[in-house]
Amino acid sequence: MDLADLKNKLNRPVTLWGMMGAGKTKTGRHMASLLNLSFLDSDIEIEKAAGMTIPEIFEKYGEAWFRCGEEKVIRRLLADENPCIIALGGGAVMSTATQALLSRKALNIWLR
């Protein structure tokens, strides 16, 4: 199977998840470039939506608030179901609601 075949078979977003430093962003950008797909990073999208950095969110509102916002952003990124590559934050899969959303809406790849 070549890259064109792979791209044609993708019918949903691909998410990359793993611990911090696993290479989600680097791998995601490379995959998106090879497949000519959009690349999104959920951490960057969270910061845009909140108007502050992730450390600032944690300091001001705490982890529970952050995880709730993270789930909303991931839900938005997966809403149109078009193929794209999405790098998730290291703790995104800690939420059972986010896990369920990802299992329904995306092809998920764990990088270790």
Predicted feature residues:
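Extreme N-terminal, non-catalytic leader segments
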Residues: 1-12
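ATP-dependent small-molecule kinase phosphotransfer cores
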Residues: 38-103
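Conserved phosphate-donor/acceptor-positioning beta-strand/loop module used by diverse small-molecule
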Residues: 102-112
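Hydrophobic anchor at the beta1->P-loop junction of P-loop NTPases
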Residues: 16
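Short, conserved catalytic or interaction motifs in soluble domains
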Residues: 22
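P-loop (Walker A) phosphate-binding loop of NTP-binding proteins
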Residues: 19
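Walker A/P-loop
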Residues: 25
